[in-house]
């Protein structure tokens, strides 16, 4: 049976699983879908065309599915889609997409979103991502699986942050961070491969060694970006356990529109 506090407002049209719990003074809009065993904290607002999957935990005073902070937005029925088993803590704001992009903001599964985080319109957050308190994502930001964003960091619009990377606290990021790389500073600069994170996630010593070699080619050998990419492509077909990881590294760089941190 759905447990809805008597002071909460659930507008007609909302689709709420019978196992959902909604706390005091929370508001759920008419175009919202909430999956099984999800809990909505007190005073939270879930609005817009928002879909929440199963087993999510929304903290007190969170604002989920709000209008994009984009002056071009004209009340189009854009969306926010959130997967399963996400923790979204107090005072977090997550906005719907815009028609200037694909019209949807997405958050995958098993993410840990700490207090006061902002996820802007059209962002695409993968799985198992950690966004530390007060991390701020502008519109159209992409964050790969297992990335970690330090507290008080700011990420410029359209920036891409690769899988398994890490952005240090209080950083200002204006260009893309390749996968597996640690970045920090204002403005953020590269500081090596995220070795500890890769070990925790089961990457083999050979794969980590290959990524370290890739990092040296890109950042330490005095090569231009185009020269480095030629050698990185050769490294990616060396026949070792690190080929797949190095290939992902190179493909991310090739796809960059804003340029990578250097």
From Swiss-Prot:
Query: Which key words tag this protein in UniProt?
Result: Acyltransferase, Cytoplasm, Lipid A biosynthesis, Lipid biosynthesis, Lipid metabolism, Repeat, Transferase
The main place the protein resides is cytoplasm
* A Gene Ontology BP annotation from the UniProt entry: lipid A biosynthetic process
Molecular function (Gene Ontology), one example = acyl-[acyl-carrier-protein]-UDP-N-acetylglucosamine O-acyltransferase activity
UniProt cross-references to Pfam families, sorted A to Z: Acetyltransf_11, Hexapep
Instruction: Identify the pathway.
Output: Glycolipid biosynthesis; lipid IV(A) biosynthesis; lipid IV(A) from (3R)-3-hydroxytetradecanoyl-[acyl-carrier-protein] and UDP-N-acetyl-alpha-D-glucosamine: step 1/6
What the entry lists under NCBIfam families is as follows: lipid_A_lpxA, PRK05289.1
Subunit structure as annotated in this protein's UniProt entry: Homotrimer.
Biological role stated in the UniProt entry: Involved in the biosynthesis of lipid A, a phosphorylated glycolipid that anchors the lipopolysaccharide to the outer membrane of the cell.
The UniProt entry's sequence similarity note says:
Belongs to the transferase hexapeptide repeat family. LpxA subfamily.
The molecule here is called Acyl-[acyl-carrier-protein]--UDP-N-acetylglucosamine O-acyltransferase
Q: What is the lineage of its organism?
A: Bacteria, Pseudomonadati, Pseudomonadota, Betaproteobacteria, Burkholderiales
Its gene name is: lpxA
């Amino acid at each position: 049976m759905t447990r809805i506090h008597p002071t909460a407002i659930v507008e007609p049209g909302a689709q709420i699983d019978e196992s959902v719990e909604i706390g005091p003074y929370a508001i759920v809009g008419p175009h919202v879908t909430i999956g099984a065993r999800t809990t909505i904290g007190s005073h939270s607002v879930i609005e817009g065309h928002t879909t929440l999957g199963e087993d999510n935990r929304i903290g007190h005073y969170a604002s989920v599915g709000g209008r994009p902070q984009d002056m071009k937005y004209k009340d189009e029925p854009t969306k926010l889609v959130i997967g399963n088993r996400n923790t979204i803590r107090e005072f977090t704001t997550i906005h719907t997409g815009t028609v200037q992009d694909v019209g949807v903001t997405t958050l995958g599964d098993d993410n840990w979103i700490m207090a006061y985080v902002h996820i802007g319109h059209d962002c695409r957050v993968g799985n198992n991502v950690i966004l530390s308190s007060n991390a701020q994502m502008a519109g159209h930001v992409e964050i790969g699986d297992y990335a970690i964003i330090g507290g008080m960091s700011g990420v410029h619009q359209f920036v891409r942050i690769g899988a398994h990377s890490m952005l240090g606290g209080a950083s200002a990021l204006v260009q893309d961070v390749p996968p597996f790389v640690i970045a920090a500073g204002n403005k953020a600069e590269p500081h090596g491969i995220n070795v500890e994170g890769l070990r925790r996630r089961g990457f083999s010593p050979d794969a980590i060694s290959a990524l370290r070699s890739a990092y040296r080619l890109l950042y330490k050998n005095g090569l231009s970006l185009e020269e480095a990419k030629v050698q990185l492509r050769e490294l990616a077909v060396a026949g070792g356990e690190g080929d797949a990881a190095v290939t992902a590294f190179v493909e991310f760089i090739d796809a960059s529109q804003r340029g990578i941190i250097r």
